[in-house]
């Protein structure tokens, strides 16, 4: 009988990458994604409805409609209550980003003896054109890379002390008191950051009269090695604006 295999990634975008690659490779395995980025949002202390709602609400109430909140909450509840023991193998795809690693730690809690992980970091040296650092995240992977670098062959079973360590890491980070958790592309180690850690950079570039897109691009370049997404930067810009710490009436570019 054919094995029942599930692949898990940390974002909808990465799910699309795997689905496209698998289509070309004739693979029909199921692929799911974690609907909340725990590197920059509240990590639930348990999987109760109240805690899961806190995670969803932390995404930013001004960025979500009521429909969005209900949809994400439903997806998150499904994610943490799925019977993963019904699969022969559960593959977690990850790189060195905090979001990827936190997914791996979470899946160590949710699975039994069927968890495997595919660490794409070993392919980093082949993807220098996309990322100059030792660690990469799933965002560096395109569909062709999955076949070219035989990434499925990188799968390793998570067991024993390794799984215990990952569970310990999840318990550690869910107790984090700071809002951001990012890992360095140079070390692959997660550290926590305060809410205002990039405020000075945002305000500095905003004062140059940059339009919003250019402002986000400059801030992104400053923190690229922490795998920070533009959505995180936009969220903080909006928070600063609401707190009257940032003037978003930026000037029109000069021709």
Question: What does each model-identified segment do?
Answer:
Residues 175-255:
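C-terminal, charge/polar-rich interaction regions
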Residues 119-137:
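Short, conserved secondary-structure transition motifs
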Residues 132-210:
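A conserved mid-domain beta-alpha-beta active-site/ligand-binding segment of alpha/beta enzyme cores
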Residues 61-104:
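Long, hydrophobic/aromatic-enriched structural stretches that serve as scaffold segments
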Residues 1-68:
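A structured, charge-rich N-terminal accessory region that forms the first stable segment of a protein
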